[in-house]
Design a protein with these regions (language model features):
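ALDH superfamily catalytic-core signature
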Residues: 53-60, 80, 93-231
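Rossmann-like NAD(P) dinucleotide-binding subdomain of oxidoreductase/dehydrogenase enzymes
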Residues: 1-130
C-alpha cells in the first residue's frame, strides 16, 4: 500500500506565479501530503493570493503553509530539514544542485533550465515559421523555459535571404514598452539585466554576429529591445 509523503516543499519560480505552484501544490495535496510553499522573492504576493484562495476553498491552514521569506539561512534550513519528504522545483539547474548539496538524500522533483528550440526545414512555411519563432522567443520578454530561444535552420533555410529579411522585419516591428499598454509586445524583464543575461545581451561569442542587436531602452536595465544573434 502506498504511503504518502508527510511533507512536501514547493519552491516555484516567479515567471508563472500561479499556474506552476498550483500544479505542485494540488498534486502533493491529492497524494496525501502536507505542503509548505516557499515562493520566489519576486512573486511573494501572487503566492499569498493563491494560498488564500485554497484556504477559502477548504484546504486547512495547517496542511498548506506559506513560508514567505527572503533567501538565506532560513531557506537552507527549510530545504535541509529532515521532516521534509519531497521537494518540487521548477527552476535553474544551479538551484537544483544547490538544494541537493544541502541534503543529498532528499527526493527532488525538478524541471531545470529548459532550452526550447524551433527547427525550420526547407519544406516549412517560412512565413509561418518566422511568426512562430518571434512570438515564442519574445513573448513574456523571453522569460520562460518554453521560449524558443534557439532557432535551428536546416539546409537552404540557413542561407535564405528571404527568411533573414522576414525575421529582421518581424523582430524590429515588435513594440517594446509597459505591460499595462495593450499595444506592447515585449515588456520589461523582472530585474535589471546582470551576470549571464547581461553578457548575452551585450557580447558575442566566437563566430557569432548580430542579425538584430538588442538595445537598452531605460536607465534601470529592465527594458531591452529584442535581439537575434547568428552563428551560434
Amino acid at each position: 500500500r502506498p504511503v504518502p509523503v508527510a511533507l512536501t516543499v514547493v519552491t516555484p519560480p516567479w515567471n508563472f506565479p500561479v499556474a506552476i505552484p498550483c500544479g505542485g501544490i494540488t498534486a502533493a495535496l491529492a497524494t496525501g501530503s502536507s505542503v509548505i510553499v516557499k515562493p520566489a522573492p519576486q512573486a511573494r504576493r501572487s503566492a499569498a493570493v493563491l494560498l488564500e484562495a485554497l484556504w477559502e476553498a477548504g484546504v486547512p491552514r495547517d496542511v498548506l503553509v506559506l513560508c514567505d521569506m527572503v533567501e538565506g539561512d532560513v531557506s537552507r534550513h527549510l530545504v535541509a530539514h529532515p521532516a521534509v519528504g519531497r521537494l518540487i522545483l521548477p527552476g535553474s539547474s544551479s538551484t537544483a544542485a544547490l538544494f541537493s548539496s544541502w541534503r543529498p538524500d532528499l527526493p527532488l522533483l525538478a524541471e531545470t533550465s529548459g532550452k526550447n528550440a524551433i527547427v525550420v526545414t526547407p519544406s516549412a512555411d517560412l512565413d509561418l515559421a518566422v511568426g512562430d519563432l518571434v512570438r515564442s522567443a519574445f513573448g513574456h520578454a523571453g522569460q520562460k523555459c518554453s521560449a524558443a530561444s534557439l532557432g535551428i535552420l536546416v539546409g537552404s533555410v540557413a542561407t535564405s535571404e528571404r527568411f533573414r529579411r522576414q525575421l529582421v522585419d518581424a523582430v524590429q516591428t515588435l513594440r517594446v514598452g509597459s505591460p499595462m499598454d495593450p499595444r506592447t509586445h515585449v515588456g520589461p524583464i523582472i530585474e535589471p539585466a546582470q551576470g549571464r543575461l547581461l553578457a548575452a545581451l551585450t557580447t558575442l561569442g566566437e563566430g557569432e554576429s548580430w542579425l538584430v542587436e538588442p538595445r537598452q531602452l531605460d536607465a534601470e536595465g529592465r527594458l531591452w529591445s529584442p535581439g537575434v544573434r547568428i552563428g551560434v
